[in-house]
């Protein structure tokens, strides 16, 4: 299913849903960041997805990272809450979703990199190389906040 992101765009569709979702900022022992290239829009992002009924939010993080990348993680902490009503995602099925995303830092504890139906590429990326990837500005904000380990409190916005 295709997706178009609108960010403070007057031509954006009106949102008709809000789905709690997560993304995971995962760094390996070399300090590289786990990134996925999404199959729905071709952009690079942190792995993540929607929260399912019956799950704790930490379980959602673990499941989504495993599903999209093959990597097993342990959730460390919350780096931010992202609820910008000016960020709307339109999907091919007519859904127009307002952003509602929790970003968690997580540690890899096992697994082997692989793609999924939601990812065309999965790789560990040196932080110095992140600027060369096509990353949506709201995802870049999450990455920047998660990389700032000196933040005393999570981002709320």
Could you say what each language-model-derived stretch is?
Residues 72-82:
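A short coil-to-beta-strand element that immediately follows conserved catalytic motifs
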Residues 42-43, 112-157:
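Nudix hydrolase/Nudix homology domain
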Residues 1-23, 94:
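Acidic, metal-coordinating catalytic segment for phosphate/diphosphate chemistry
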Residues 24, 78, 104-106:
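A structural signal for short, well-ordered beta-strand segments
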Residues 19, 39-41, 46, 73, ...:
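Short connector loops at helix/strand junctions that flank enzyme active sites
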Residues 28, 32-68:
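Conserved Nudix-box catalytic region and its N-terminal flanking loop in Nudix hydrolases
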Residues 84-112:
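Active-site-adjacent beta-strand/loop module that shapes the phosphate/pyrophosphate-binding cleft
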